[in-house]
Amino acid sequence: MRWALRLVAGDTSGSLSALCVIRDSEGRWLAGRRAAWLASWPSRWALGAGGAVDPGESPATTLTRELDEEWSVAPARIQAEALVRMPNDMVMFVGQAWLAPGAQVTPDHEHDDFAWWPADPDDWPDEADEPLRRAAKLVA
């Protein structure tokens, strides 16, 4: 798939970030608990990987880079899901990545736990808050 969306150096319209939820070959969701020492969302469960799109970088490249940095994994496939303008003028590119059967993940230092949650968000554990369930249903 070719991606045409890029952040141009010097553009002042707001920042561009990318977020990628991660699914395995069985459709399960990778959830990671953020470390307690982090300034944003400490000790909260989150889906996937994400970060800022660097100037000149495509969102697909950002997603692949973040998957490697946060989970030490390369996706078998990435699919674009949504482009969302946030209230703070940030634009969020949302994608979904699927891992090859048998792929192993290794969380980075910003995660203190991880789990594979069932394919159906209605079957997720109590640690999954309502915003996570709603977000998952948007891309499921």
Sequence positions of predicted segments:
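N-terminal leader/linker segments that precede catalytic domains of diphosphate-processing enzymes
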Residues: 1-45, 51-65, 73-103, 122, ...
